[in-house]
């Protein structure tokens, strides 16, 4: 009888406790994966950003080098933001874009960007995005609409003012950010993109991306 009651209590407790969501890795950063990612060259850019795979003691990484270039790597992936709303990014800027005004069209380049995308219409132009950036000139926490479209918000998660040529890990609550910046209650995102771009400034940037994933906390 005692054993039966214990079993009932255990089952009841299991039903009450929330289910722990496992982290969701977005990129593997392997040569094989690199071949499958969607490459999108920015319209008007003279060159494509060069992306190669490397590794260190913490695993694989993506190295991006842009010389008067702009192209991104995209991946369609569904992420349930009710379970795993937090994006985690580890990145490093080796060569930044010192002196540019990132909130203007002429200076709208970033050594590091990770776009989180939500489809909100029939065409890509209707999509809304939060653009998490590694800034060369602005402080962490600064944000503004892209000078090209209000449907994309630039949000500074890291800056070379504080971290130049060193690895840094940051996180952000994507669900809260879509509500804050777009007034959207988003339960699921549709894609992630990475880009290092210098097509507006005509400069050179070198950045490394590693271990991008979503988690519950």
Range-by-range predicted roles:
Residues 7-16:
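Bacterial N-terminal signal peptides
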Residues 51-72:
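Short carbohydrate-recognition loop motifs
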Residues 107-152:
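Extracellular/luminal beta-rich ligand-recognition
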Residues 109-114, 150-151, 156-160, 164-204:
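Extracellular beta-strand ligand-recognition surfaces/modules
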